[in-house]
């Protein structure tokens, strides 16, 4: 009886119902297609010719080679309808409605984000390599570099959460949250209690969360529940029963802005596993950062872009009310440069991946990574191996206990090639590494939400911080070195697998860019 109740509860979940309806659409599409092609061999031949033409078209596109390979394999396996399938869901057309909403907001935000030419000039004179990276980010991501900014690094979700709660209790004007995952429990309920109290004090509280990220954790009407408490809420890109790849484009960002003076980002979401109140995959190794000073202004603008793109007209925020000059100055001068940046799937500029590649190519002594997933294209693989062959100390820390076992099989499929090329890979013994960051040569680091995998690099909305020559860089390095003490290094002999296992990994790796 208990099993039956659990089974019925599972069947009643929204994701199950919506997925089933999409499955029915696919079956109807396949059935109708086979029926049409059965009428005439000429129709069948026409669709096969279409598939050949689509393969030629894909070969001449400027897409990532791994993505092109995945689609070509699909079309070759199913030549009858593979070409039509690509034309239906393979291009960028499904995200056109996201582009229409977001691009005007990004353009409006750009009017308020101005780079300081003095910073660029100073960097050119003393560090041309870093100057070029900052130039790239300012022009491709649209967010400027700042001095007079401070970043505090927290090597665990528990540490970051405590400071988040403290800062939230100090809020006087507004609290803006944009997160991929929210789940009821100790962490979120603590935050929600503070938010409710702040609403009563007249603070403007707004929450934006991703629908797929929360689909197992929150009821479908949770946004209404928050609105009844006085919290304005948007659910990003709802999962609805329509067959489309638009649902691949998720809001994976983690942004908390308080009064325009303090901001947080990093790897942690609002769920108990991120602060180790619930352990499903051993110890959850994550991180977070607090930003103060002028760089908070860019974090505010990131939230404004996404919020105004999807809010009702009456709930939209006025860009003119947010000024860089209003950001609370630091108590003392901080050294170094902080550049918050974002990445989105609305164009062919993959900022997150380019930041990582630029760091790898510029590394002289070492480059270290935290990443929960390692599913990368040939450009990143080549950059990592070439860096190792140049004598750079390249180290990557991945989970010892993964949160997604099938994805981890794909991650492990890269080990052999990288290890043979001189890259050192380590698995974290106590549990799951969920932090996403890199540190290079004691002077540059990047930290945020961007995993080394296809979804983060090509499909999701993401955000990060580029840090140069400030104390946080060394804090990140220390965290990675401390974590290495609890890791097992992957040796060449450990990469040898049986033929069946290698075949499975190879198949998963081919289709990874399409998942």
Question: Predicted regions span which residues?
Answer:
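N-terminal localization/anchoring segments of enzymes in phospholipid and broader phosphate metabolism
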Residues: 1-354, 358, 362, 402, ...
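Glycine- and other small-residue-rich loops at beta-strand/loop junctions that grip anionic moieties
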Residues: 180, 372-373, 407
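Residues at alpha-helix boundaries and short interhelical turns
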Residues: 216, 371-374
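Helical hairpin unit composed of two closely spaced alpha helices linked by a short loop
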Residues: 363, 373-394, 399, 404
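Thr-Gly-centered strand-to-loop micro-motif
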Residues: 370-371, 398, 428, 447-448
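Short, solvent-exposed amphipathic alpha-helical segments in soluble enzyme
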Residues: 383-387, 413, 481
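A beta-strand-loop signature enriched in Asp, Gly, Thr, and Trp
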Residues: 390, 395-440
């Amino acid at each position: 009886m208990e099993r039956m109740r659990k089974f019925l509860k599972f069947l009643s979940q929204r994701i199950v119902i919506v997925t089933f309806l999409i499955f029915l659409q696919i079956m109807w599409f396949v059935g109708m297609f086979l029926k049409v092609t059965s009428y005439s061999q000429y129709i069948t031949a026409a669709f096969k010719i279409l598939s050949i033409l689509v393969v030629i078209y894909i070969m001449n596109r400027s897409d990532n080679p791994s993505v092109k390979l995945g689609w070509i394999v699909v079309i070759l396996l199913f030549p009858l309808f593979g070409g039509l399938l690509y034309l239906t869901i393979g291009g960028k057309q499904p995200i056109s409605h996201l582009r229409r909403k977001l691009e005007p907001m990004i353009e409006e935000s750009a009017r308020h984000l101005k780079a300081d030419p003095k910073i660029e000039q100073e960097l050119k004179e003393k560090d041309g390599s870093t100057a070029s990276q900052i130039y790239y980010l300012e022009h491709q991501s649209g967010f400027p570099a700042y001095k007079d900014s401070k970043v505090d690094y927290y090597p665990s979700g528990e540490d970051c959460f405590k400071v988040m709660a403290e800062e939230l209790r100090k809020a006087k004007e507004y609290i803006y949250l944009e997160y991929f995952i929210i789940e009821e429990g100790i962490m979120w309920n603590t935050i929600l209690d503070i938010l409710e109290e702040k609403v009563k004090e007249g603070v403007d509280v707004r929450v934006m969360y991703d629908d797929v990220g929360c689909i197992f954790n929150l009821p479908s009407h949770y946004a209404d529940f928050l609105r009844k408490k006085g919290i304005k809420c948007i659910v990003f890109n709802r999962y609805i029963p329509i067959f489309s790849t638009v649902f691949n484009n998720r809001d994976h960002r983690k942004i908390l802005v308080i009064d325009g003076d303090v901001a947080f980002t990093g790897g942690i979401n609002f769920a108990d596993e991120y602060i180790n109140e619930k352990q499903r995959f051993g110890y959850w190794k994550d991180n977070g950062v607090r930003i103060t000073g002028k760089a908070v202004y860019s974090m505010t603008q990131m939230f404004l872009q996404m919020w105004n793109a999807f809010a009702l007209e009456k709930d939209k925020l006025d860009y003119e009310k947010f000024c860089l000059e209003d950001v609370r100055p630091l108590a003392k001068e901080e050294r170094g440069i902080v550049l918050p940046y974002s990445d989105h799937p609305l164009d062919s500029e993959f900022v997150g991946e380019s930041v990582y590649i630029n760091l790898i190519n510029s590394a002289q002594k070492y480059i270290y990574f935290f990443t929960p997933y390692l599913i990368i294209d040939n450009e990143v693989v080549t950059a990592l191996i070439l860096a190792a062959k140049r004598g750079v100390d390249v180290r990557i820390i991945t989970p010892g206990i993964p949160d997604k076992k099938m994805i981890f099989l794909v991650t492990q499929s890269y080990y052999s090639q990288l290890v043979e090329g001189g890259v050192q890979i380590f698995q974290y013994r106590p549990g799951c590494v969920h932090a996403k960051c890199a540190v290079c040569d004691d002077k540059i680091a990047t930290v945020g939400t961007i995993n080394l995998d296809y979804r983060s690099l090509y499909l999701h909305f993401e955000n990060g911080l580029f840090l140069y020559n400030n104390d946080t860089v060394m804090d990140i390095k220390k965290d990675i070195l401390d974590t290495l003490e609890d890791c097992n290094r992957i040796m060449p002999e450990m990469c040898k697998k049986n033929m069946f296992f290698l075949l499975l990994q190879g198949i998963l790796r081919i289709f990874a860019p399409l998942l």
